[in-house]
């Protein structure tokens, strides 16, 4: 659809672009990225015929751009500008109708029924038909942008150029506009070429991305390849981190603010932050901790500052336990979004905790454990599914900076240590009469201060893994013994 070869040029004697070559396929949503001054707007001006170029070629549908008359070009390409303004006062419909100019013939440019059908269709597609009689200047920024998009679509172009189309739009309008662009690219095979400042939006919506740097192409590829952490840091000269989108297989880039000296101050989570009561065990950290957990609240990964292990009756049963737990936390002064919350049917005074230190990092481990519903995982299919409150709840606080894989290693290591504790105590699955590996609803938390020593791994023979193994084993054994003794005393 569009083929660019060796494009060089700029303004006056100043060359902004240097030997730029690429192609864009029919029905593709193609994003152009780059820092300020990289040549994005200059390139778009050349592609749309607004700015001449000195060297190279631009071919649209196999025909050189310079062979098109202005009217012919307007029948093939349309441009949605960055700013939404008009020199004269028009209604929405009149504004959209201007897009039909390129298709009108004769001296009097008569309005045809086909023009009317097309204008009504694109107004409906862009969601502006309901206010087509309102004046353009009375509309919000997002509405104006949609009207100008309808005007561009009224040209019935094969290629649509967008110059930072979401720059002045609210989040909802950004999503609406880009959802529509992607839909039209897929369903109508409209070729969309857009400049983006927002790397995350570009990564979410584009089929391919082109990254410019100082007038030259740095890379052209699918979003996940273009949006590499090291590359973006080098081109944009700032610190970022790359993470996957939580709902889609798309990359997302996050800027990392420069840390203040207080962000590096030593901090050790230990017994001084722990409070054990009859109803809850709570640990309140002075800073948010990076977490990975299977809690009722705060599950998955995140940042949390408060940690609650709540005692409930063994017959506890709520259809929406998340909502009930959230309400409970609120009534006790905790914000659910900032709290990892767990439940247990064991008495909280049987808790076991232990602080262990290595040369330059430490861990604080807390375990509540009962084995009334112990299960051998290898024979779990012999059990019926009954949701009961978590019985072995394990908290591991790491005073160090964990890598992503170290969180997962920590869970694996802790699980192995827990299984060994149950084996040594001869905890049996009451259904199968075999040694249990855990209970039906065990929960775990890994929380790191993200300060101090960088800890890449937490396997069983690593320094961190050794502390976790010993701490979880000892605390699990102690908690089970204390719980057994408590039951005997009842």
What residue spans do the PLM features occupy?
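Helix-to-loop junction immediately C-terminal to a conserved catalytic motif
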Residues: 48
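Conserved ABC transporter NBD signature motif
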Residues: 56-64
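Alpha/propeptide regions of enzymes that mature by internal proteolysis
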Residues: 264-490
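ABC ATPase nucleotide-binding domains
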Residues: 237-270
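Catalytic Walker B motif of ABC-type/P-loop ATPase nucleotide-binding domains
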Residues: 160-164
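Conserved catalytic motifs of ABC-family nucleotide-binding domains
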Residues: 156
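The feature captures the beta-strand-to-loop junction immediately N-terminal to the Walker
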Residues: 33-35
